[in-house]
A protein has these predicted regions:
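A short, N-terminal "cap"/entry segment at the start of jelly-roll beta-barrel domains
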Residues: 1-27, 70-71, 75, 107-110
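Conserved short histidine dyad/triad with adjacent acidic residue
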Residues: 13, 27-44
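A generic "binding-loop/recognition-motif" signal
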Residues: 35, 45-46, 65, 81, ...
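Short beta-strand His + acidic residue motifs that chelate non-heme Fe in jelly-roll/DSBH
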Residues: 39-41, 59-60, 77, 82-88
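Glycine- and acidic-residue-biased ligand/ion/polar-headgroup-sensing regions
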Residues: 46-62
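A cytosolic small-molecule/anion-sensing beta-strand core signal
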Residues: 53-54, 70-71, 89
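Short acidic-glycine-tyrosine-enriched beta hairpin
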Residues: 63-80
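Ligand-binding loop in jelly-roll beta-barrel domains
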Residues: 79-103
Length: 110
């Protein structure tokens, strides 16, 4: 078993840290998003689960639906669903992408 205390990990802004990655299964990543910064409108090939560990974020989906939340918020995006994430305060996030890599992802090619 591998384990991490997500509340105490030293994660630098703009340097996502891959915690665990198993081909064909999932990839777990932590992010530090400073207050006022954002992950601009994007999509990923995998189903994306975003969990707020600390701070507060605002999530916008397809330029329409907006959800705001702090620690404990779980947002799940379908593969290729466009979204953006803004930090309302310094935020620490856990991102789980599954399956890893998803269909169409450049890393899925053998």
């Amino acid at each position: 078993m591998e384990h991490w205390d997500l509340s105490t990990l030293d994660v630098e802004p703009h340097k996502p840290q891959v915690l665990h990655s198993t081909r064909g299964e999932a990839r777990s990543i932590t992010l530090h998003l400073p207050a006022g910064e954002e992950l601009q409108d994007h999509q990923v090939h995998e189903r994306a689960h975003v969990v707020v560990i600390a701070g507060e974020i605002e999530v916008e989906v397809d330029g329409a639906e907006v959800v705001t939340g702090g620690p404990g918020l779980l947002a799940v995006f379908d593969p290729n669903e466009r979204h953006e994430v803004r930090a309302r305060s310094d935020a620490r996030l856990l991102l789980v992408l599954a399956p890893w890599p998803g269909p169409g992802h450049p890393g899925a090619r053998d």
